[in-house]
Swiss-Prot record:
The gene is rpmE2. The keyword Protease does not apply. SUPFAM superfamilies: L28p-like. This is Large ribosomal subunit protein bL31B. Belongs to the bacterial ribosomal protein bL31 family. Type B subfamily. Keywords: Ribonucleoprotein, Ribosomal protein.
Length: 89
């Protein structure tokens, strides 16, 4: 590796603000903020809006947005066209 061209790899404190959960993860992210963690050490700090602790897919709180499949919706929408064509023949 060439010296001086790679970012510093260090332990960073990530905070999921939606779930109020902290993660200590090795990262190269650049941040000016720092925060003291529960272990008494000060780490670089990054606030997150969503993480695995608050995302609906990972928490099991995912809501089903479609009540029926795309094919069933298509058939329901165009069912009257098929019956009208048969009656005309």
């Amino acid at each position: 590796m060439k010296p001086g061209i790679h970012p510093d790899y260090r332990t960073v404190l990530f905070h999921d603000t939606a779930a109020d959960v902290y993660f200590l993860i090795g990262s190269t992210v650049d941040t000016d903020r720092s925060h003291t963690y529960s272990d008494g050490k000060t780490y670089p700090y990054v606030a997150l809006d969503v993480s695995s602790a608050s995302h609906p897919v990972y928490t099991g709180q995912q809501r089903k947005t479609q009540s029926e499949g795309r094919i069933a919706g298509f058939n329901k929408r165009f069912a009257s066209f098929g019956s009208g064509a048969k009656a005309a023949q």
